[in-house]
Amino acid sequence: MGKNDIYLYGMTLASTMNLLVGGYPEADTYSEIKESYVLPGGETGSCAVVLSSLGCTVKLDGNYQGPKTQKVLDEYLVRKFGIDMSGVYFDETFEGVQDMILIGTNTRTCFGTFGAYFGNDIKRWNKPERKDIESCEVVGLDPFFMDESEQVADYCHELGKKYVTIDCKYDTVIHKYSEVNILSNEFIKGNYPERDIEELFKEYTENTEGLVIFTFGSREIMFGRRNQSIKRMKPYKVKVQSTLGAGDTFKAGAIYGVLKNMSDEKIVQFAAATAATVCSRFPLALYPPDLETINKLINN
């Protein structure tokens, strides 16, 4: 059994990406499409592309694939980036998870069938394999697959493996055991709309030994740990082509930072620079970030 740098558990899908000329259109109007692609996407799919492009060996698992997703994922993730998808289940009765995204000047709007996917009586995602976690250095964990995601957190805790996660509540097992939890502005507004941000941040840090990061798009990043004062950092400024995948690639940068034993400040710097680099180019699977560009952005 080979040893991988990274094990990722979460959502990998086929995305139809339409980059618009200008901003998102008003209803009942016309908008020109500048570029269009069908490429790997999803929180874990995008994360895997970035980590592979940074020189990491990656194995991923999570949702089932089907006839409409397998070809593009095999072409890019497996053959182009060398990502191990050998454990992912192919379900010929299921098309696979897909979405369609319209990308405006500073927006990206996603259309999909995730409500139907997660609301279905049939769970179309794998149970995690303990041996996959045992044979990696660091784990990236999406919290969306219910008991199975929590099982990954339990395995990591039992095996002493550090993991980075995203967008889970402060009273969950996944948050409790995490090395890093990254909370997006979208998640915070959707789940804690009335909460004072600093009080909420403190609640998060009190419920884990790990690093907590709050992101707010182009506004200041908040980060810190239990019994520490809140630290802040301004995101890096770049000429934005597309904000699609910014959160997924921030997570990838944090995973890389944990793998390389970076300090908290360096993890946040590297994650923010990785996300900024991705925002400056499009699409991710054709133009992934590289260490030279990321480090140049940090050092400048």
Locate each region found by the language model.
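Glycine-rich phosphate/adenosyl-contacting loop at the front of the ribokinase-like
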Residues: 1-61, 71
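Conserved phosphate-binding/catalytic region of the ribokinase-like
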Residues: 2, 197-300
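Structural motif
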Residues: 5-7, 137-138, 180, 211
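Hydrophobic anchor at the start of a short beta-strand
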Residues: 6, 57-58, 85, 163, ...
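Conserved N-terminal subdomain of the carbohydrate kinase-like
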Residues: 27-34, 53-137, 295-300
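Gly/Ala-rich phosphate-binding loop of Rossmann-like dinucleotide-binding domains
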Residues: 52, 157, 259
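Short beta->alpha connector loops
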Residues: 66-67, 143-147, 167-171
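Conserved phosphate/ATP/ADP-binding segment of small-molecule kinases
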Residues: 153-232
